[in-house]
Amino acid sequence: MANTNLANAKTAKNDEFYTQYPDIQKEINAYLDYDPNVFRGKTVLLPCDDPEWSNFTKFFAQNFELLGLKKLISTSYAPESKKYKIPYQPTLFETEQPHFNADKSKTHGKIFVLERDVTGDNRINIEDLQWQYLEGDGDFRSKEIRKLRDEADIIVTNPPFSLFREFVVWLVESEKKFAIIGNVNAISYKEVFPLIKDNKMWMGVSIHSGDREFGVPDTYPLEASGWRIDENGNKYIRVKGVRWFTNIDHGRRHEPLRLMTMAENFKHSKHKEIRGQKDYVHYENYNAIDIPFTDAIPSDYEGTMGVPITFLDKYCPEQFEIIGHPHGDYGLELGLKPYPRELKELNKGLRDGDLYYMKDGKPELPYRRILIRKKQSV
């Protein structure tokens, strides 16, 4: 399965996933549609990058003037500092520079900066990109990269999957605008969910379902079904459950869901689990009903509902309030009642703090839910 690639990346610390240009373009364009000046006069930092290969650097450098950027900074991580060792391949862009050092290129990160017309053609674009070696290896946690973070206004990148939690903490410390790529299951992380609940982070626009294709190094093991090699020998894999996480506003975030009433759902829902029913399933350990599909949320229900985490793809903060994430310690904090001992005998996998309902005399656990409630003003 394609999502095996994500698990492999976490295990092997092989985080060299190169985001495709169209995926970057679609997301950034959505921000521009909502606010054409969102990047104007701003310094953009692209950390955790490989600028010689990266489509992030290519996109922002090619569109420097269109976006109205003040400065573009992109940093790379030293090859020998990576947990997953791959043969180092310097590009012509690197080797043709007089300050190129083959040994230093393996042990030091690099910084690429674009802020002025170097070529003299009266344009600022990718041809004006300049690079130098960093003092260190380019680790985003280093003082050197933190200083660049603090200089920036907006941070955009596809951070290492294995370090996503730590990267989010690093971002929050900066109080900067950001757009980063991660797996949808990161919604459940303790470093992430409180930000979503408090409307300090939300889902991006352009990726809502299915999988996405990423470029990978030549040495990446193609062990899953979702991969291909193009006519030039470049390798690609498909990864499921990918999302943009951002705090840059966009229009879709403010579009209320169009929903049917409870009665209409029972009569017209396309889901057999809903159509023909007389009521939604009620949880045993929390006063809420279970909604297994986002489009089955009843528009006229005033109480608390448990919805799939993918609801966040269509979440409108003016329409709904997020109550919490009822799993484990989060659930206990919300007041979910512990499981009776006799139920744990029926299902050894039960964990206090998780939502459940009864089905055929046995406890059933719905897959990852978020508790929400409709706002009265909508």
Across the structure, where does each feature detected by a protein language model lie?
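Class I S-adenosyl-L-methionine-dependent methyltransferase catalytic core
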Residues: 1-156, 160-378
